[in-house]
Amino acid sequence: MYNVLTDLQEYYETEIRILQQTKERKEVSTLQKNYAIQRCLGASFYAQRLGADFDKIDKLYTKCKKTIDNI
């Protein structure tokens, strides 16, 4: 069975990994962080439309946002 939350978490991890790799080469700008957060939020809305549980999406998104903010 297709698991939307697993795909969503993998997407978040990819966004975080991209920012971390960017940070290794140069400083990550606030604009880059905000853009990554917006992409994660968009993926969250899409996951909700596919029927994923909102509370679980919110928990994953909050964790992702905090991680991105700390990069």
Predicted features by range, described:
Residues L31-N70:
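Short, charge-rich amphipathic interface segments used for partner binding and complex assembly
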Residues M1-T30:
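N-terminal acidic leader/helix
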